[in-house]
Amino acid sequence: MDTELLKTFLEVSRTRHFGRAAESLYLTQSAVSFRIRQLENQLGANLFTRHRNNIRLTPAGERLLPYAETLMSTWQLAKKEVAHSLQHTELSIGATASLWEAYLTPWLQQLYKQRETLRLEARIALRQSLVKQLHERQLDLLITTEPPKMDELASLLLGHFSLRLFSSIPFELPEKTDDGTEHKNANEAPYIKLEWGADFHQQESRLLNSEQMPVLTTTSAHLTRQLLDTTGGCAFLPEHWQKEYPELVVNADIPPIVRPLYAVWLQNSDQQTLIRQLLKTPMNNAAQSAIRD
């Protein structure tokens, strides 16, 4: 349905006069009458009764009125949102919560310091959801530890980052019992499972060698850090956080897990130039690979 017809209907119902409605809409009176007839033909019902200068809504017109108001309000909101997106969003970037919190937020801060007019949309979601958005052209750039294997996607290795097993209290060394067996292994501490990718969980299981269920499973690195003291647990967190959060205690017996960091976008994306320009800005605390033009 043509929204201009609904707009004309609402103006006539408000003014109860075709001439005044025409003035408000900057139309001729005949154009207003023609639009109303078009709308009536589409609906198969008369919307106004006309007795000289006395114009009233018919029962059909009364029923249409609230729907017309809602439709026009929704249409105006839709136009506003589309215009806002065109004016204020240059590029949409997606990543998991843990990557945003640990590495990408400082990178974003650097980008805005370098480009005052930069307009971005930062999305936080699970990797599977972001890959789908990228494939459907709803997302411009994906930052992930595992690039999707799709022919239409281009990927670039940005570098690597290191994760260490942290707790908020010192890890206890294994103690020996009278028969010589060890107990109180550090791996027996409550464990918080943080999402760092499917490949990570394989390394995680191999290093911890523990079958205990995690006390918490989450995608948020900051939530994990804040709950270490409460739970008395441990978790794999960014190695550089040891300097930022002195309360974190590293388990020196567990080696670091090194993860790759990739940028992924559509090969035929019209944002490729901007994407490559932004990726030249180093991601602090993640070793950088060379990014060429």
Curated annotation (Swiss-Prot):
The keyword NADP does not apply. One of its GO terms (biological process) is negative regulation of DNA-templated transcription. It comes from the Bacteria. Residues 18-37 bind DNA. It holds the Pfam family HTH_1. Keywords: DNA-binding, Repressor, Transcription, Transcription regulation. PROSITE patterns: HTH_LYSR (PS50931). One of its GO terms (molecular function) is DNA-binding transcription factor activity. Residues 1-58 form the HTH lysR-type domain. Negatively regulates the transcription of the flagellar master operon flhDC by binding to the upstream region of the operon. HAMAP family: HTH_type_HdfR (MF_01233). PANTHER family: HTH-TYPE TRANSCRIPTIONAL REGULATOR HDFR, TRANSCRIPTIONAL REGULATOR. Belongs to the LysR transcriptional regulatory family. This is HTH-type transcriptional regulator HdfR. It comes from Yersinia enterocolitica serotype O:8 / biotype 1B (strain NCTC 13174 / 8081). The lineage of its organism: Bacteria, Pseudomonadati, Pseudomonadota, Gammaproteobacteria, Enterobacterales. The gene is hdfR.
